[in-house]
Amino acid sequence: MSIPVAQACSFLFVPATHPERFQKALASGADMVIVDWEDAVAPADKAGARVALLEAALTLDAAQRARLLVRLNAEGTPWFADDLAALAQLMARGLAGAVVPKAEHLPTLQAVAHAAGARAALLPLIESVAGLDAVDALA
């Protein structure tokens, strides 16, 4: 059963480099599963992690895809632009939305929102003093 992201109480992270774990994570009882492209993925594996999630999304049913979020790499990293392109494809396949790490600037959230589309949930992570200072603008 899928619930709106805004009502989710539990989130489980799973590395995108291990698509064999996606089903287990979805069956864990967590309300939402966050497939991680950021910290759980080595730099050399970033492109493969995007492909793994894109391919895995094709094997999941609509209710399962609606419980998936993807944690992007932060803006300013070499992977951010490619993450946004892949995010657009994933949203077309019915994923719930994106987790935006190190959120500090409104234009970053706007870029993610543009790539993800109007129905996407965006969960900005405030991880720095700069993000905390900008929290009103980010809301």
Spans of model-derived segments:
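Conserved alpha/beta-domain cores
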Residues: S2-A139
